[in-house]
Structures are given as structure tokens and as C-alpha cells.
């Protein structure tokens, strides 16, 4: 799938939210953390990722275009919080108590670990598998691990190994 061109107005809205959240955090934490690099290269079903060492936030342009307001309100502060926790506390659990505190007490945003965006447009091909009780769809990555003998996946309901087909 070709990455969509993001309108400049959306990029500006993302940057505005990032700068507002960063200024708020710097004020509350009495720090001067720098602005992270912002890129629109995230792919797949992840809305965004925070890269600690490069101090960079990668956002999914497809999910952003499809969910502009919710994406800017939730994903931008979520990823910024990861970077701020790393700067403020060092390496901690990705969604641990420090991250939750940063989201809720510092940025004033509900601390949700996952987004609820519709994923139909970014979902890759899946492969049919089954167990004794139901059908399953495995991603390409999981399917390839099964084929190579690197993994066995089990049904969360009946506990039986999943079988292709």
C-alpha cells in the first residue's frame, strides 16, 4: 500500500499538539526537554512508536488520515510520554507506572495502552487456521513462524494447537 500524502494542515496540527504537550510537561517537570523528531513512517497496525535513542516519534500516516482528531489527541501524547519517561526516569517498563503518571498527571490524557482505530485499511493478508472450537486468522509473520517450525500457537479458549486450513 502506498503511503498517503499528509496535508500540511494535519502535519501542523500534529506538531502543534506535540509542542503544547511538551511545553506542558517541561513546565510541570521544571525541565527543558528538547522537541523530538517527528516522522510519518510507521506502518502496519501500530499507530505510532517512540524510538528512545534517536529521540524520534514515528506515526502511521494511514491511521492518522483516517482518524485525525482522535489520533492527534491520543497517539501524539502517548508516544511523547514514552520519550519523556525515558528522559526523566531512564529505561522503564513501556506502559508502567511512570508512563501512566506521565500521561495522566503531567500531560492530562487518559493512559490507554492501545488505540481503537479501525484497521481494515492497514491490515495485511491473514492465513486461516482452526482449532477444535473455532476459526482463527494468523498474520503473515505468525504463519511464517509456524511454517518454519519456530512457533506453535494455541487457542486461548480451548488450548488446542492451531492447525492451518
From Swiss-Prot:
Entry-linked NCBIfam families: PRK04860.1
Database matches in Pfam families: SprT-like (PF10263), Zn_ribbon_SprT (PF17283)
HAMAP family in the cross-refs: SprT
Cofactor binding comment, as recorded: Binds 1 zinc ion.
Subcellular location: Cytoplasm
Cofactor: Zn(2+)
Active site: 79
InterPro entries with a match to the protein in the record: SprT-like_domain, SprT_Zn_ribbon, Uncharacterised_SprT
TM regions (residue ranges): none
Biological source species: Salmonella arizonae (strain ATCC BAA-731 / CDC346-86 / RSK2980)
Cellular component, GO, one term: cytoplasm
GO biological process terms, semicolon-separated: response to stress
Coiled-coil stretches noted in the UniProt entry, renumbered to this chain: none
Primary subcellular site in the record, as a coarse category: cytoplasm
Binding-site residues, Zn(2+): 78, 82
Domain SprT-like positions: 20-163
Keyword line: Cytoplasm, Metal-binding, Zinc
GO molecular function: zinc ion binding
The family this protein is said to belong to: Belongs to the SprT family.
Protein name as catalogued: Protein SprT
Amino acid at each position: 500500500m502506498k503511503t498517503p500524502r499528509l496535508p500540511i494542515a494535519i502535519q501542523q496540527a500534529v506538531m502543534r499538539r506535540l509542542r503544547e504537550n511538551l511545553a506542558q510537561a517541561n513546565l510541570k517537570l521544571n525541565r527543558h526537554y528538547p522537541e523530538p523528531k517527528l516522522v510519518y513512517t510507521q506502518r502496519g497496525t501500530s499507530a505510532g512508536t517512540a524510538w528512545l535513542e534517536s529521540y524520534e516519534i514515528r506515526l502511521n500516516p494511514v491511521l492518522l488520515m483516517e482518524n485525525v482528531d482522535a489520533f492527534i489527541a491520543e497517539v501524539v501524547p502517548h508516544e511523547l510520554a514514552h520519550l519523556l519517561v525515558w528522559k526523566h526516569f531512564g529505561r522503564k517498563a513501556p506502559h508502567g507506572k511512570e508512563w501512566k503518571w506521565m500521561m495522566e498527571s503531567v500531560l492530562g490524557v487518559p493512559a490507554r495502552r492501545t488505540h481503537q482505530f479501525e484497521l481494515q485499511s492497514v491490515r495485511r493478508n491473514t492465513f486461516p487456521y482452526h482449532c477444535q472450537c473455532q476459526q482463527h486468522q494468523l498474520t503473515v509473520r505468525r504463519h511464517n513462524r509456524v511454517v518454519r517450525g519456530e512457533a506453535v500457537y494455541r487457542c486461548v479458549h480451548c488450548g488446542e494447537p492451531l492447525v492451518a486450513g
